[in-house]
């Protein structure tokens, strides 16, 4: 079963962190644990892809968050959402009854593309392990 934990990652300039968006996840999901990952976690964690994270940090912070998300999901389980996304209603408990789930990107603009900003799994999920 997927744990009721929302993981939200923001690396870079904390003054630009979309706290208004993050708060929508907190407000609509009061019975979930919300874990905000940030700049301090880059050095505090023993990342498997630390070398890639460091190299990516020189070019694109979105890529750093992408690399972090897979390791967080694999190690902790839960649901990772993009920090700049808004939650408009609470998440349904039936989603948690599965080993993993993901959402499609915009089907009109990007058909059959899985949205990396909305992925969930149990800790140790082998598919997520293969991504890492």
PLM regions: where:
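A structural motif
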Residues: 118-132
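Generic detector of well-ordered alpha-helical segments enriched in charged/polar residues
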Residues: 23, 53-54, 92, 128-132
């Amino acid at each position: 079963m997927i744990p009721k934990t929302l993981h939200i990652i923001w690396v870079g300039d904390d003054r630009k962190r979309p706290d208004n968006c993050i708060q929508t996840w907190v407000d609509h999901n009061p019975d979930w644990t919300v874990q905000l990952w940030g700049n301090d976690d880059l050095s505090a964690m023993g990342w498997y892809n630390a070398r890639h994270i460091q190299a990516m940090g020189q070019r694109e912070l979105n890529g750093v968050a992408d690399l972090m998300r897979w390791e967080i999901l694999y190690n902790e389980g839960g649901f990772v959402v993009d920090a700049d996304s808004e939650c408009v209603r609470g998440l349904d408990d039936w989603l948690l009854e599965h080993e993993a789930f993901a959402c499609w990107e915009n089907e009109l603009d990007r058909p059959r593309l899985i949205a990396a900003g909305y992925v969930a799994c149990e800790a140790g999920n082998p598919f997520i392990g293969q991504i890492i």
